[in-house]
Amino acid sequence: MLKLGSLELGALPRIAVPFSDRAGRGEVQALRRRGLDVAELRVDRFADPAPARVLAQLDKFTGLPTIATIRIRAEGGGWIRGEAERLALFHALAPRVAALDVELAAGEIRAEVVAAAHQASGLAIVSHHDFGGTPEPGELADVVGRGLEAGADVVKIATAVRDPADVRALASAALAHGGANLILIGMGEAGVATRLLFAALGSLLTYASAGEATAPGQLLFDEMLALMRRLFPAYDAAKAADLDHLDPV
């Protein structure tokens, strides 16, 4: 079973929330105390991504497994600087976080980011985003295969969903792989249900918002948490037990 830091992935669905540098420690820790599972550090949304400033932000996430993401503009992120600078940030972050998320399309730096994650005993998430639509099942299977060949521990696929056929295409990817090593998300209003449905099909993480959505169709964290606890009894029981023994960092 995969572990994100000390958190097991796969047995239960998990909720991740993306944060920029605007989030305060109090806000992050309040979400942790309410049941947040995973924090995603969106370095591409930082006002100043200087390495020292980025690393200083990590203290906010004490007690939470953290994914470091530096998303390029072409895949919905805010990173417009050079790849050498992005790679240097990934190397600086690797020993301090539980996982690095890099795009399948990242080209030359992808292999180095994957290696940096593994050298630091973390997970490598290789991601693919399509804001234009959802590919056919065969194309999705190809993305999964290429991600795993690239050394991914987890392949993340997020596509724009327009109709039920798109939902079925994404669901087919989950069913074909038993959900193992996958994060699948249907973006947009038509894809909101996938953020819950795919957890039942084995998708390892679903993403929610603390107020500033980073993708179309993201639900607010408290709304997502309530739905997950209502729809997944095992998650509800585990969450109740976790909160009873929460370390008050």
Regions found by a protein language model. Name each.
Residues 11-15, 35-37, 62-66, 96-98, ...:
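Short, well-ordered coil/turn segments that N-cap beta-strands
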Residues 18, 38-48, 69, 79, ...:
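Catalytic beta/alpha-barrel core
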Residues 1-26, 233-249:
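N-terminal amphipathic alpha-helix/helix-capping segment at the start of soluble metabolic enzymes
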Residues 64-71, 214:
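Active-site cofactor/substrate anionic-group-binding motifs, chiefly glycine-
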Residues 1-19, 70-77, 116-130:
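N-terminal small/glycine-rich loop or linker at the start of catalytic domains
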Residues 105-249:
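Catalytic alpha/beta core domains of metabolic enzymes, predominantly
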Residues 28-35, 50-66, 88-95, 111-121, ...:
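Acidic (Asp/Glu)-rich catalytic clusters
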Residues 19-34, 81-92, 136-146:
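Short, acidic/polar
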